[in-house]
């Protein structure tokens, strides 16, 4: 056909080195694609296997029955995943609300008001972002312990609401595309800065809010290290920490762990399917049009 002829004609313009490089690129993509898919397939197949099937078959072998939901039921009950999910939702709602309000207000001040020390404050937040969180946990844990906030869901929420530099810079980036004429027009109409923030800035920052909530929400939902450090009581564990129930000194029940992993992924998958349009628009939007 004419299409095939055109493709063959275009291929003549490629050198041997270019063709080899294209082959290497596609081969690399296929290889890394398999590397990403294999653990997911292994997790799904293992979640449906009985204990005997898991011990006597390899991880990629299909289970005897895809209708074996015993692992899911046992994982949900044993790890008290219903309560863990509720705890995760509480943490996420509070942390994301605080992150959006504080981050957007801080970005509004740093972007709209030019005052002595503006650049210094930005540099301080940049330095805070460069400090590894693990290295600061000793000091943070001592402070939380002195305040009797360890082993408390409220204390963990307060700790998780700490400096969110990424969200602040996301809001600053979006605000730079919002014309100052909107602020000036609102001031002429009698609005103060507080009203400008709530009635003009915040509604226009919806794409940035979506982006910030995605980045922060995924991190909070999947957080294991800090949750394991501050949430020791079973009734206040989060979803990520509840999976540790099946790990013991006598071994790990990987079929139950895989079932728990799938259960913990379902809420995030449902949110993604229902809100994928807003998610994509929030990530790709680089400007706000007035």
Positions of predicted regions on the chain:
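Short, Lys/Arg-rich, polar N-terminal cytosolic tail immediately upstream
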Residues: 1-16
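A structural signal for multi-pass alpha-helical bundles of membrane permease subunits
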Residues: 13-17, 21-290
């Amino acid at each position: 056909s004419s299409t095939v002829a055109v493709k063959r004609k275009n291929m003549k313009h490629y050198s041997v080195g270019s063709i080899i490089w294209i082959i290497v690129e596609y081969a690399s993509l296929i290889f890394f694609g398999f590397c990403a898919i294999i653990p997911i397939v292994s997790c799904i197949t293992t979640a449906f296997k009985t204990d005997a099937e898991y011990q006597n078959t390899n991880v990629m072998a299909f289970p005897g029955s895809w209708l074996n939901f015993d692992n899911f039921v046992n994982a949900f009950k044993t790890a008290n995943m219903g309560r863990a999910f509720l705890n995760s939702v509480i943490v996420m709602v509070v942390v994301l609300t605080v992150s959006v309000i504080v981050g957007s207000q801080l970005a509004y001040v740093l972007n709209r008001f030019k005052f002595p020390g503006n650049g210094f404050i930005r540099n301080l937040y940049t330095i805070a972002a460069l400090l590894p969180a693990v290295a600061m946990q000793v000091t943070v844990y001592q402070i939380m312990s002195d305040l009797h906030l360890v082993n408390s869901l409220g204390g963990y929420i307060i700790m998780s609401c700490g400096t969110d530099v990424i969200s602040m810079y996301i809001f600053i980036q979006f605000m730079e595309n919002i014309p100052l004429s909107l602020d000036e027009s609102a001031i002429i109409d009698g609005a103060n800065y507080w009203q400008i923030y709530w009635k003009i800035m915040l509604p226009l920052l919806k794409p940035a809010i979506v982006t910030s909530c995605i980045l922060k929400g995924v991190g909070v939902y999947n957080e294991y290290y800090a949750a394991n450090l501050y949430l020791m009581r079973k009734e206040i564990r989060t979803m990520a920490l509840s999976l540790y129930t099946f790990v013991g000194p006598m071994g790990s029940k990987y079929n139950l762990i895989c079932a728990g992993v799938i259960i913990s992924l379902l809420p995030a998958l449902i949110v993604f399917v229902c809100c994928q349009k807003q998610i994509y628009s929030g990530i790709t939007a680089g400007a706000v049009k007035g």
